[in-house]
Protein backbone atom coordinates (compact mmCIF):
# COMPACT_ATOMS: atom_id res chain seq x y z
CA UNK A 1 0.00 0.00 0.00
CA UNK A 2 2.88 2.40 0.80
CA UNK A 3 6.03 3.05 -1.21
CA UNK A 4 8.18 4.11 1.74
CA UNK A 5 8.24 4.64 5.46
CA UNK A 6 8.48 8.34 6.26
CA UNK A 7 12.07 8.45 7.46
CA UNK A 8 13.30 6.38 4.50
CA UNK A 9 13.00 9.64 2.56
CA UNK A 10 15.50 12.48 2.38
CA UNK A 11 16.92 15.21 0.18
CA UNK A 12 18.15 12.61 -2.32
CA UNK A 13 14.51 11.71 -3.10
CA UNK A 14 13.53 15.20 -4.31
CA UNK A 15 11.29 14.94 -7.37
CA UNK A 16 10.30 11.34 -6.62
CA UNK A 17 6.65 10.26 -6.41
CA UNK A 18 5.73 8.53 -3.15
CA UNK A 19 2.76 6.94 -1.42
CA UNK A 20 2.72 7.23 2.38
CA UNK A 21 0.44 5.91 5.13
CA UNK A 22 0.03 7.02 8.72
CA UNK A 23 -1.73 9.14 11.32
CA UNK A 24 -2.25 12.88 11.62
CA UNK A 25 0.20 14.00 14.27
CA UNK A 26 -0.67 17.69 13.89
CA UNK A 27 -2.70 19.87 11.53
CA UNK A 28 -2.16 23.53 10.55
CA UNK A 29 -4.10 25.73 8.11
CA UNK A 30 -1.89 28.62 6.95
CA UNK A 31 -3.95 30.93 4.79
CA UNK A 32 -5.50 28.26 2.65
CA UNK A 33 -2.49 25.92 2.48
CA UNK A 34 -2.88 23.01 4.90
CA UNK A 35 0.18 21.43 6.52
CA UNK A 36 -0.15 17.97 8.06
CA UNK A 37 2.54 16.20 10.06
CA UNK A 38 2.03 12.57 9.07
CA UNK A 39 3.31 10.03 11.58
CA UNK A 40 4.13 6.39 10.96
CA UNK A 41 6.20 4.01 13.03
CA UNK A 42 9.45 5.45 11.70
CA UNK A 43 8.74 9.12 12.40
CA UNK A 44 7.13 12.25 10.98
CA UNK A 45 7.06 13.88 7.54
CA UNK A 46 5.31 17.09 6.49
CA UNK A 47 2.50 16.97 3.93
CA UNK A 48 1.59 20.13 2.00
CA UNK A 49 -2.00 20.29 0.71
CA UNK A 50 -2.21 23.32 -1.61
CA UNK A 51 -5.41 23.93 -3.62
CA UNK A 52 -3.20 25.11 -6.51
CA UNK A 53 -1.73 21.59 -6.70
CA UNK A 54 -4.90 19.57 -5.97
CA UNK A 55 -8.24 21.06 -4.98
CA UNK A 56 -9.60 17.62 -4.15
CA UNK A 57 -6.70 16.74 -1.84
CA UNK A 58 -6.97 20.15 -0.16
CA UNK A 59 -10.68 19.70 0.45
CA UNK A 60 -10.15 16.27 1.97
CA UNK A 61 -7.31 17.62 4.12
CA UNK A 62 -9.61 20.30 5.52
CA UNK A 63 -11.67 17.51 7.12
CA UNK A 64 -8.68 15.74 8.70
CA UNK A 65 -8.05 15.93 12.44
CA UNK A 66 -5.50 14.52 14.89
CA UNK A 67 -5.13 10.72 14.75
CA UNK A 68 -7.12 10.35 11.52
CA UNK A 69 -5.62 7.61 9.33
CA UNK A 70 -4.42 8.96 5.97
CA UNK A 71 -3.02 7.63 2.72
CA UNK A 72 -1.17 10.34 0.83
CA UNK A 73 0.34 10.37 -2.65
CA UNK A 74 2.56 13.14 -3.90
CA UNK A 75 6.01 14.40 -4.84
CA UNK A 76 9.03 15.11 -2.65
CA UNK A 77 10.38 18.66 -2.74
CA UNK A 78 12.94 20.52 -0.62
CA UNK A 79 11.63 22.85 2.05
CA UNK A 80 11.95 26.57 1.42
CA UNK A 81 14.86 28.65 2.65
CA UNK A 82 14.75 29.05 6.44
CA UNK A 83 12.03 26.39 6.78
CA UNK A 84 14.25 23.35 7.43
CA UNK A 85 13.34 21.57 10.71
CA UNK A 86 16.54 20.10 12.21
CA UNK A 87 14.51 18.23 14.86
CA UNK A 88 13.08 15.86 12.23
CA UNK A 89 14.94 13.26 10.20
CA UNK A 90 12.82 14.43 7.27
CA UNK A 91 13.25 18.10 8.16
CA UNK A 92 14.81 19.07 4.82
CA UNK A 93 11.88 17.87 2.71
CA UNK A 94 8.10 17.88 2.41
CA UNK A 95 5.52 16.07 0.29
CA UNK A 96 3.34 18.05 -2.12
CA UNK A 97 0.12 16.04 -1.98
CA UNK A 98 -1.70 15.20 -5.20
CA UNK A 99 -4.08 12.60 -3.76
CA UNK A 100 -5.31 12.15 -0.20
CA UNK A 101 -7.55 9.50 1.33
CA UNK A 102 -9.01 9.51 4.83
CA UNK A 103 -8.85 5.79 5.50
CA UNK A 104 -10.38 6.10 8.96
CA UNK A 105 -11.48 8.78 11.39
CA UNK A 106 -10.61 9.05 15.06
CA UNK A 107 -12.54 10.09 18.14
CA UNK A 108 -10.97 12.97 20.04
CA UNK A 109 -7.95 11.39 21.82
CA UNK A 110 -7.95 11.61 25.64
CA UNK A 111 -4.41 12.98 25.49
CA UNK A 112 -1.85 14.20 22.98
CA UNK A 113 0.36 11.29 21.92
CA UNK A 114 3.64 13.12 22.59
CA UNK A 115 2.55 14.68 25.91
CA UNK A 116 4.96 13.33 28.54
CA UNK A 117 3.03 14.87 31.44
CA UNK A 118 0.01 12.58 31.01
CA UNK A 119 -0.95 10.54 34.07
CA UNK A 120 0.38 6.98 33.71
CA UNK A 121 -2.94 5.38 34.61
CA UNK A 122 -4.62 7.24 31.74
CA UNK A 123 -1.82 6.18 29.41
CA UNK A 124 -2.21 2.54 30.45
CA UNK A 125 -6.00 2.66 30.05
CA UNK A 126 -5.48 3.78 26.45
CA UNK A 127 -2.26 1.86 25.91
CA UNK A 128 -3.03 1.34 22.20
CA UNK A 129 -2.82 5.13 21.82
CA UNK A 130 0.15 5.49 24.16
CA UNK A 131 2.12 3.04 22.01
CA UNK A 132 1.79 5.41 19.05
CA UNK A 133 4.42 7.56 20.76
CA UNK A 134 7.61 7.25 18.65
CA UNK A 135 9.75 7.09 21.82
CA UNK A 136 7.92 3.98 22.98
CA UNK A 137 8.13 2.47 19.51
CA UNK A 138 11.91 2.93 19.61
CA UNK A 139 12.00 0.93 22.86
CA UNK A 140 10.26 -2.00 21.17
CA UNK A 141 12.35 -1.74 18.02
CA UNK A 142 15.41 -2.05 20.26
CA UNK A 143 13.84 -4.93 22.17
CA UNK A 144 13.24 -6.77 18.89
CA UNK A 145 16.88 -6.25 17.86
CA UNK A 146 18.02 -7.57 21.23
CA UNK A 147 15.91 -10.74 20.90
CA UNK A 148 17.15 -11.40 17.37
CA UNK A 149 20.76 -10.83 18.46
CA UNK A 150 20.34 -13.18 21.44
CA UNK A 151 18.87 -15.91 19.25
CA UNK A 152 21.56 -15.57 16.59
CA UNK A 153 24.39 -15.43 19.12
CA UNK A 154 23.25 -18.51 21.04
CA UNK A 155 22.48 -20.43 17.84
CA UNK A 156 26.01 -19.68 16.62
CA UNK A 157 27.34 -21.19 19.85
CA UNK A 158 25.40 -24.41 19.26
CA UNK A 159 22.40 -23.77 21.51
CA UNK A 160 19.03 -25.24 20.60
CA UNK A 161 15.86 -23.21 21.18
CA UNK A 162 13.29 -25.35 23.00
CA UNK A 163 9.92 -24.27 24.41
CA UNK A 164 9.01 -25.56 27.86
CA UNK A 165 5.49 -25.89 29.33
CA UNK A 166 3.44 -22.93 30.56
CA UNK A 167 0.92 -25.13 32.38
CA UNK A 168 3.00 -27.02 34.90
CA UNK A 169 3.28 -28.14 38.53
CA UNK A 170 3.67 -25.77 41.46
CA UNK A 171 7.21 -25.91 42.87
CA UNK A 172 8.67 -23.65 45.56
CA UNK A 173 10.96 -21.11 43.88
CA UNK A 174 10.70 -18.20 46.29
CA UNK A 175 7.55 -16.39 45.15
CA UNK A 176 3.87 -17.30 45.04
CA UNK A 177 2.60 -19.21 42.02
CA UNK A 178 -0.24 -18.21 39.75
CA UNK A 179 -2.60 -21.18 39.83
CA UNK A 180 -4.82 -22.34 36.95
CA UNK A 181 -7.77 -24.60 37.85
CA UNK A 182 -8.26 -27.75 35.80
CA UNK A 183 -11.76 -28.35 34.41
CA UNK A 184 -10.97 -31.98 33.58
CA UNK A 185 -9.37 -32.73 36.96
CA UNK A 186 -11.60 -30.72 39.24
CA UNK A 187 -10.07 -29.62 42.52
CA UNK A 188 -6.59 -29.76 41.00
CA UNK A 189 -4.49 -26.90 39.68
CA UNK A 190 -1.72 -26.17 37.25
CA UNK A 191 0.82 -23.47 38.07
CA UNK A 192 2.26 -20.94 35.67
CA UNK A 193 6.07 -21.30 35.73
CA UNK A 194 8.17 -18.90 37.77
CA UNK A 195 10.99 -19.98 35.47
CA UNK A 196 11.79 -22.94 33.19
CA UNK A 197 14.36 -24.06 35.78
CA UNK A 198 13.44 -27.71 36.26
CA UNK A 199 12.48 -28.34 32.64
CA UNK A 200 15.78 -27.02 31.33
CA UNK A 201 17.61 -29.25 33.81
CA UNK A 202 15.56 -32.19 32.53
CA UNK A 203 16.60 -31.29 28.97
CA UNK A 204 20.22 -31.60 30.10
CA UNK A 205 19.38 -35.02 31.56
CA UNK A 206 17.92 -35.82 28.12
CA UNK A 207 21.24 -35.09 26.43
CA UNK A 208 20.26 -31.85 24.65
CA UNK A 209 23.59 -30.39 25.85
CA UNK A 210 22.85 -26.72 25.01
CA UNK A 211 19.40 -25.15 25.41
CA UNK A 212 18.01 -21.64 25.28
CA UNK A 213 14.62 -19.99 25.29
CA UNK A 214 13.25 -16.47 25.42
CA UNK A 215 10.83 -17.50 28.13
CA UNK A 216 7.75 -15.95 29.68
CA UNK A 217 7.73 -16.33 33.47
CA UNK A 218 5.10 -15.60 36.12
CA UNK A 219 5.47 -14.63 39.77
CA UNK A 220 2.71 -13.49 42.09
CA UNK A 221 4.72 -11.00 44.13
CA UNK A 222 4.48 -7.39 45.21
CA UNK A 223 5.39 -5.08 42.35
CA UNK A 224 8.12 -2.47 42.17
CA UNK A 225 9.36 -0.21 39.39
CA UNK A 226 11.39 -3.07 37.92
CA UNK A 227 8.99 -5.97 38.60
CA UNK A 228 5.93 -7.31 36.78
CA UNK A 229 3.75 -10.38 37.45
CA UNK A 230 4.72 -11.69 34.01
CA UNK A 231 8.15 -11.05 32.59
CA UNK A 232 10.56 -12.36 29.98
CA UNK A 233 14.00 -13.85 30.42
CA UNK A 234 16.75 -15.12 28.15
CA UNK A 235 17.07 -18.61 29.59
CA UNK A 236 20.20 -20.70 28.99
CA UNK A 237 21.42 -24.11 30.16
CA UNK A 238 24.44 -26.20 29.14
CA UNK A 239 25.96 -29.56 30.02
CA UNK A 240 29.53 -30.57 30.87
CA UNK A 241 30.43 -27.07 31.96
CA UNK A 242 32.04 -25.14 34.77
CA UNK A 243 31.17 -21.68 36.05
CA UNK A 244 33.72 -20.04 33.74
CA UNK A 245 32.06 -21.67 30.70
CA UNK A 246 28.61 -20.28 31.53
CA UNK A 247 30.09 -16.85 32.22
CA UNK A 248 31.91 -16.89 28.86
CA UNK A 249 28.68 -17.79 27.02
CA UNK A 250 26.72 -15.08 28.84
CA UNK A 251 29.33 -12.42 28.11
CA UNK A 252 29.35 -13.43 24.45
CA UNK A 253 25.62 -13.09 23.89
CA UNK A 254 25.38 -9.96 26.04
CA UNK A 255 28.12 -8.35 23.96
CA UNK A 256 26.23 -9.28 20.78
CA UNK A 257 22.97 -7.90 22.20
CA UNK A 258 24.53 -4.57 23.10
CA UNK A 259 26.23 -4.35 19.72
CA UNK A 260 22.86 -4.84 18.02
CA UNK A 261 21.52 -2.02 20.21
CA UNK A 262 24.33 0.29 19.10
CA UNK A 263 26.56 -0.02 22.17
CA UNK A 264 30.02 -1.57 22.47
CA UNK A 265 30.89 -3.25 25.78
CA UNK A 266 34.19 -4.67 26.96
CA UNK A 267 34.60 -8.28 28.05
CA UNK A 268 35.49 -10.04 30.24
CA UNK A 269 33.52 -8.35 33.02
CA UNK A 270 35.22 -7.88 36.36
CA UNK A 271 34.34 -10.36 39.13
CA UNK A 272 33.78 -9.87 42.86
CA UNK A 273 32.99 -12.32 45.62
CA UNK A 274 29.63 -11.91 47.32
CA UNK A 275 31.22 -11.29 50.71
CA UNK A 276 33.41 -8.52 49.28
CA UNK A 277 30.44 -6.88 47.56
CA UNK A 278 28.52 -6.83 50.83
CA UNK A 279 31.43 -5.74 53.04
CA UNK A 280 32.70 -3.03 50.67
CA UNK A 281 29.48 -1.72 49.10
CA UNK A 282 26.60 -2.98 51.27
CA UNK A 283 24.93 -4.67 48.30
CA UNK A 284 25.09 -7.90 46.33
CA UNK A 285 24.62 -5.75 43.22
CA UNK A 286 26.97 -2.81 43.71
CA UNK A 287 26.97 0.13 41.31
CA UNK A 288 30.61 0.57 40.29
CA UNK A 289 30.15 3.74 38.24
CA UNK A 290 31.43 5.60 41.30
CA UNK A 291 33.72 4.83 44.25
CA UNK A 292 32.65 5.64 47.85
CA UNK A 293 33.86 2.22 48.96
CA UNK A 294 33.35 1.24 52.61
CA UNK A 295 36.34 1.29 54.96
CA UNK A 296 36.36 -1.21 57.83
CA UNK A 297 37.24 0.59 61.08
CA UNK A 298 35.79 -1.73 63.72
CA UNK A 299 39.23 -2.52 65.17
CA UNK A 300 39.98 1.18 65.71
CA UNK A 301 36.59 1.82 67.33
CA UNK A 302 37.25 -1.12 69.68
CA UNK A 303 39.88 1.12 71.34
CA UNK A 304 37.55 4.12 71.75
CA UNK A 305 36.28 5.44 75.08
CA UNK A 306 32.71 5.44 73.77
CA UNK A 307 30.90 2.58 75.50
CA UNK A 308 28.34 2.12 72.71
CA UNK A 309 30.91 1.85 69.93
CA UNK A 310 33.27 -0.24 72.05
CA UNK A 311 30.51 -2.77 72.81
CA UNK A 312 29.55 -2.98 69.14
CA UNK A 313 33.19 -3.59 68.23
CA UNK A 314 33.51 -6.53 70.63
CA UNK A 315 31.53 -8.89 68.37
CA UNK A 316 33.15 -8.74 64.93
CA UNK A 317 31.03 -11.61 63.61
CA UNK A 318 27.60 -10.11 64.31
CA UNK A 319 28.42 -6.39 64.13
CA UNK A 320 30.03 -3.93 61.74
CA UNK A 321 31.47 -0.41 61.87
CA UNK A 322 31.95 0.99 58.37
CA UNK A 323 33.22 4.34 57.14
CA UNK A 324 32.56 6.22 53.90
CA UNK A 325 35.01 8.99 53.02
CA UNK A 326 33.71 11.86 50.89
CA UNK A 327 36.60 13.86 49.39
CA UNK A 328 36.07 17.60 50.03
CA UNK A 329 32.70 16.76 51.58
CA UNK A 330 33.27 19.20 54.44
CA UNK A 331 33.49 22.03 51.93
CA UNK A 332 30.42 20.82 49.99
CA UNK A 333 27.78 19.78 52.52
CA UNK A 334 25.72 22.29 54.48
CA UNK A 335 24.54 21.70 58.03
CA UNK A 336 21.04 21.04 56.70
CA UNK A 337 22.40 18.43 54.26
CA UNK A 338 24.20 16.66 57.11
CA UNK A 339 20.89 16.54 59.00
CA UNK A 340 19.16 15.12 55.92
CA UNK A 341 21.79 12.40 55.68
CA UNK A 342 21.02 11.27 59.22
CA UNK A 343 17.28 11.41 58.56
CA UNK A 344 17.83 9.22 55.50
CA UNK A 345 19.75 6.42 57.24
CA UNK A 346 17.35 6.41 60.20
CA UNK A 347 14.59 5.32 57.79
CA UNK A 348 16.52 2.08 57.28
CA UNK A 349 17.26 1.21 60.89
CA UNK A 350 20.26 3.39 61.78
CA UNK A 351 20.42 4.81 65.29
CA UNK A 352 22.27 7.82 63.92
CA UNK A 353 25.08 8.83 61.58
CA UNK A 354 28.39 9.78 63.14
CA UNK A 355 30.94 11.82 61.19
CA UNK A 356 34.35 13.47 61.42
CA UNK A 357 35.39 16.56 59.49
CA UNK A 358 38.96 17.26 58.39
CA UNK A 359 39.93 20.86 59.11
CA UNK A 360 43.24 22.66 58.58
CA UNK A 361 44.06 22.11 62.25
CA UNK A 362 43.08 18.43 62.35
CA UNK A 363 40.09 16.12 62.81
CA UNK A 364 36.97 17.70 64.28
CA UNK A 365 33.63 16.39 65.48
CA UNK A 366 31.87 14.96 68.55
CA UNK A 367 33.48 11.55 67.99
CA UNK A 368 37.06 12.79 68.29
CA UNK A 369 36.99 13.10 72.08
CA UNK A 370 36.57 9.33 72.41
CA UNK A 371 39.85 8.52 70.64
CA UNK A 372 43.49 8.98 71.54
CA UNK A 373 45.65 11.05 69.23
CA UNK A 374 47.33 7.84 68.09
CA UNK A 375 43.97 6.25 67.21
CA UNK A 376 42.84 9.38 65.34
CA UNK A 377 46.04 9.27 63.33
CA UNK A 378 45.39 5.61 62.55
CA UNK A 379 41.82 6.45 61.52
CA UNK A 380 43.07 9.27 59.31
CA UNK A 381 45.63 6.99 57.68
CA UNK A 382 43.14 4.11 57.21
CA UNK A 383 40.59 6.42 55.56
CA UNK A 384 43.27 8.35 53.62
CA UNK A 385 41.80 11.62 54.89
CA UNK A 386 42.80 15.01 53.52
CA UNK A 387 41.88 18.55 54.50
CA UNK A 388 38.29 19.33 53.47
CA UNK A 389 37.11 15.70 53.63
CA UNK A 390 34.28 14.34 55.72
CA UNK A 391 34.00 10.71 56.78
CA UNK A 392 30.71 9.10 57.85
CA UNK A 393 30.41 6.09 60.16
CA UNK A 394 27.74 3.42 60.45
CA UNK A 395 27.76 1.06 63.44
CA UNK A 396 25.55 -1.76 64.68
CA UNK A 397 24.27 -5.17 63.64
CA UNK A 398 25.95 -6.46 60.49
CA UNK A 399 22.84 -6.82 58.32
CA UNK A 400 21.41 -3.44 59.31
CA UNK A 401 24.67 -1.50 58.90
CA UNK A 402 25.51 -2.98 55.51
CA UNK A 403 21.98 -2.25 54.30
CA UNK A 404 21.68 1.38 55.34
CA UNK A 405 25.29 2.26 54.50
CA UNK A 406 24.82 0.69 51.07
CA UNK A 407 21.72 2.81 50.51
CA UNK A 408 23.51 5.87 51.88
CA UNK A 409 26.38 5.30 49.45
CA UNK A 410 23.96 5.56 46.50
CA UNK A 411 22.21 8.54 48.11
CA UNK A 412 25.56 10.34 48.41
CA UNK A 413 26.47 9.54 44.81
CA UNK A 414 23.25 11.14 43.61
CA UNK A 415 23.75 14.17 45.86
CA UNK A 416 27.28 14.62 44.48
CA UNK A 417 26.34 13.88 40.84
CA UNK A 418 28.96 11.13 40.71
CA UNK A 419 26.96 8.80 38.45
CA UNK A 420 27.66 8.93 34.72
CA UNK A 421 24.31 8.05 33.09
CA UNK A 422 26.09 6.89 29.92
CA UNK A 423 28.53 4.53 31.65
CA UNK A 424 28.04 0.76 31.50
CA UNK A 425 29.70 -0.99 34.44
CA UNK A 426 29.25 -4.76 34.37
CA UNK A 427 30.15 -7.02 37.25
CA UNK A 428 29.94 -10.70 38.10
CA UNK A 429 29.15 -11.34 41.76
CA UNK A 430 30.26 -14.90 42.58
CA UNK A 431 30.52 -17.34 45.49
CA UNK A 432 27.12 -16.69 47.03
CA UNK A 433 26.12 -18.36 50.29
CA UNK A 434 24.04 -21.47 49.70
CA UNK A 435 21.50 -20.59 52.40
CA UNK A 436 20.16 -17.46 54.07
CA UNK A 437 18.36 -17.18 57.39
CA UNK A 438 14.79 -15.93 57.45
CA UNK A 439 13.30 -13.65 60.10
CA UNK A 440 11.73 -16.66 61.84
CA UNK A 441 15.11 -18.39 62.15
CA UNK A 442 14.51 -20.93 59.40
CA UNK A 443 16.74 -21.21 56.33
CA UNK A 444 15.98 -21.00 52.63
CA UNK A 445 18.11 -21.32 49.51
CA UNK A 446 19.61 -17.96 48.54
CA UNK A 447 19.24 -18.74 44.82
CA UNK A 448 17.25 -21.97 44.62
CA UNK A 449 17.62 -25.45 46.09
CA UNK A 450 19.03 -26.91 42.84
CA UNK A 451 22.28 -24.92 43.09
CA UNK A 452 25.46 -26.95 43.62
CA UNK A 453 26.97 -26.35 47.08
CA UNK A 454 30.75 -26.16 47.45
CA UNK A 455 31.07 -27.56 50.98
CA UNK A 456 27.88 -29.48 51.68
CA UNK A 457 29.37 -31.27 54.72
CA UNK A 458 29.86 -28.00 56.64
CA UNK A 459 27.75 -28.13 59.82
CA UNK A 460 27.09 -24.36 59.98
CA UNK A 461 24.57 -23.65 57.21
CA UNK A 462 25.69 -20.03 56.97
CA UNK A 463 29.20 -21.20 56.07
CA UNK A 464 28.09 -23.32 53.09
CA UNK A 465 28.82 -21.53 49.82
CA UNK A 466 27.46 -22.26 46.36
CA UNK A 467 28.61 -22.17 42.76
CA UNK A 468 26.27 -19.32 41.94
CA UNK A 469 26.80 -16.07 40.08
CA UNK A 470 24.85 -12.90 39.29
CA UNK A 471 25.58 -10.44 36.52
CA UNK A 472 25.10 -6.80 37.53
CA UNK A 473 24.91 -3.68 35.37
CA UNK A 474 25.05 -0.23 36.98
CA UNK A 475 23.80 -1.53 40.30
CA UNK A 476 20.94 -3.53 38.79
CA UNK A 477 20.85 -7.32 38.78
CA UNK A 478 20.48 -8.35 35.13
CA UNK A 479 20.26 -12.03 35.91
CA UNK A 480 21.81 -14.94 37.67
CA UNK A 481 22.67 -18.56 37.42
CA UNK A 482 24.53 -21.44 38.95
CA UNK A 483 26.07 -24.81 38.42
CA UNK A 484 23.29 -27.28 39.28
CA UNK A 485 23.21 -30.33 41.47
CA UNK A 486 23.44 -33.33 39.14
CA UNK A 487 23.69 -36.09 41.74
CA UNK A 488 20.64 -37.50 43.48
CA UNK A 489 22.24 -37.90 46.92
CA UNK A 490 23.46 -34.28 47.06
CA UNK A 491 20.05 -32.99 45.96
CA UNK A 492 18.31 -35.02 48.65
CA UNK A 493 20.76 -33.74 51.26
CA UNK A 494 20.05 -30.12 50.30
CA UNK A 495 16.32 -30.79 50.53
CA UNK A 496 16.79 -32.25 54.01
CA UNK A 497 18.79 -29.20 55.13
CA UNK A 498 15.81 -27.11 54.00
CA UNK A 499 13.47 -29.32 56.07
CA UNK A 500 11.85 -30.84 53.00
CA UNK A 501 11.16 -34.41 54.10
CA UNK A 502 11.23 -37.47 51.83
CA UNK A 503 7.47 -37.43 51.32
CA UNK A 504 7.52 -33.77 50.23
CA UNK A 505 10.56 -34.44 48.03
CA UNK A 506 8.73 -37.19 46.22
CA UNK A 507 5.51 -35.19 45.90
CA UNK A 508 7.11 -31.95 44.65
CA UNK A 509 10.32 -33.07 42.98
CA UNK A 510 9.95 -36.78 42.32
CA UNK A 511 10.40 -36.34 38.56
CA UNK A 512 13.66 -34.40 39.09
CA UNK A 513 15.07 -36.95 41.52
CA UNK A 514 14.17 -39.70 39.05
CA UNK A 515 16.02 -37.85 36.27
CA UNK A 516 19.10 -37.39 38.46
CA UNK A 517 19.10 -41.16 39.06
CA UNK A 518 19.61 -41.95 35.36
CA UNK A 519 23.03 -40.52 34.61
CA UNK A 520 22.50 -36.76 34.74
CA UNK A 521 25.49 -34.83 33.35
CA UNK A 522 27.17 -31.92 35.14
CA UNK A 523 25.28 -28.83 34.01
CA UNK A 524 24.66 -25.17 34.74
CA UNK A 525 23.08 -22.11 33.28
CA UNK A 526 21.90 -18.56 33.59
CA UNK A 527 18.82 -16.42 33.03
CA UNK A 528 18.97 -12.76 32.00
CA UNK A 529 15.95 -10.53 32.61
CA UNK A 530 15.11 -9.18 29.15
CA UNK A 531 12.73 -6.47 30.37
CA UNK A 532 15.26 -5.14 32.86
CA UNK A 533 18.03 -5.28 30.26
CA UNK A 534 16.04 -3.23 27.75
CA UNK A 535 15.04 -0.77 30.48
CA UNK A 536 18.72 -0.10 31.16
CA UNK A 537 19.72 0.11 27.50
CA UNK A 538 16.93 2.57 26.66
CA UNK A 539 17.20 4.60 29.87
CA UNK A 540 13.49 4.05 30.57
CA UNK A 541 12.25 5.12 33.99
CA UNK A 542 10.15 2.00 34.49
CA UNK A 543 10.02 -1.55 33.22
CA UNK A 544 6.48 -0.72 32.05
CA UNK A 545 8.03 1.43 29.32
CA UNK A 546 9.56 -1.65 27.64
CA UNK A 547 6.60 -4.06 27.97
CA UNK A 548 3.88 -3.60 25.37
CA UNK A 549 0.90 -4.21 27.65
CA UNK A 550 2.13 -4.05 31.24
CA UNK A 551 0.30 -4.35 34.54
CA UNK A 552 0.06 -1.56 37.10
CA UNK A 553 1.63 -1.58 40.57
CA UNK A 554 -1.56 -3.37 41.68
CA UNK A 555 -1.08 -6.11 39.04
CA UNK A 556 -4.01 -4.87 36.97
CA UNK A 557 -4.41 -4.23 33.24
CA UNK A 558 -6.39 -0.99 33.08
CA UNK A 559 -7.03 -1.41 29.36
CA UNK A 560 -8.71 -4.84 29.48
CA UNK A 561 -9.82 -4.61 33.13
CA UNK A 562 -7.97 -7.80 34.05
CA UNK A 563 -8.24 -9.54 36.42
CA UNK A 564 -12.02 -9.64 36.38
CA UNK A 565 -14.71 -11.91 37.86
CA UNK A 566 -15.44 -15.18 36.07
CA UNK A 567 -19.00 -16.03 35.10
CA UNK A 568 -21.04 -18.33 37.31
CA UNK A 569 -21.14 -20.87 34.49
CA UNK A 570 -17.35 -20.90 34.17
CA UNK A 571 -16.99 -21.33 37.93
CA UNK A 572 -19.43 -24.25 37.94
CA UNK A 573 -17.53 -25.96 35.11
CA UNK A 574 -14.32 -25.62 37.11
CA UNK A 575 -15.94 -26.87 40.29
CA UNK A 576 -15.01 -23.67 42.13
CA UNK A 577 -17.15 -21.81 44.63
CA UNK A 578 -15.96 -18.54 46.14
CA UNK A 579 -16.45 -17.70 49.79
CA UNK A 580 -19.04 -15.02 50.38
CA UNK A 581 -17.99 -11.41 50.98
CA UNK A 582 -14.76 -11.77 49.01
CA UNK A 583 -13.68 -8.44 47.60
Curated annotation (Swiss-Prot):
Alphabetically sorted, this entry's keywords are: Aminoacyl-tRNA synthetase, ATP-binding, Cytoplasm, Ligase, Nucleotide-binding, Protein biosynthesis
**Spans traversing the lipid bilayer:** none
Gene Ontology terms: biological process = aspartyl-tRNA aminoacylation
Which top class of enzyme applies to this chain? Answer: ligase
Q: Which CDD domains match?
A: AspRS_core, EcAspRS_like_N
Write down the position(s) of the site called Important for tRNA non-discrimination.
30, 82
Please give one Gene Ontology molecular function term for this protein. nucleic acid binding
| Stretches the record annotates as Aspartate | 197-200
PROSITE patterns for this protein: AA_TRNA_LIGASE_II (PS50862)
Localization per record:
Cytoplasm
Classification via Pfam families: GAD, tRNA-synt_2, tRNA_anti-codon
Q: Which reaction does it catalyse?
A: tRNA(Asx) + L-aspartate + ATP = L-aspartyl-tRNA(Asx) + AMP + diphosphate
Location (main, coarse)? cytoplasm
Q: What does this protein do?
A: Aspartyl-tRNA synthetase with relaxed tRNA specificity since it is able to aspartylate not only its cognate tRNA(Asp) but also tRNA(Asn). Reaction proceeds in two steps: L-aspartate is first activated by ATP to form Asp-AMP and then transferred to the acceptor end of tRNA(Asp/Asn).
Q: Which family does it belong to?
A: Belongs to the class-II aminoacyl-tRNA synthetase family. Type 1 subfamily.
Protein's name in the database: Aspartate--tRNA(Asp/Asn) ligase
